[in-house]
Amino acid sequence: MKLYESGEDYLEAVLMLQKKNGMVRSVDLARHMEVSKPSVCHAVATLRDGGFLMMDEDHFLHLTDVGREVAEKIYKRHCFFTEQLIAAGVDPKTAEADACRIEHIISDESFSRLKEAAEQEQT
């Protein structure tokens, strides 16, 4: 199943909420992402059917191994670009919004090279 930007955003949000709160329900996701509960319900069903997410009997959301891998990849990119943009003098709110767009479109190769270059600059 091909994941679109919105699906990646949901997985990233589940990961972030799990790190912050431990357990995540659909209502937590709706609040965090500022979307409606029906939107979350639809996204969760799609991600569950795609093998990225599971919901237990208490309605808590859990990332599958594949879902966690995607979420961590997107989250790392998000953090990297946010930090780089802020370091370049971009307003933090703008940096956050721009990082959210960039994280989805950059290739693995380009991201890897940018990250390596940034790490070399720090040494």
Question: Which residues does each predicted region cover?
Answer:
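Residue-level signal for threonine
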Residues: 4, 63-64, 107
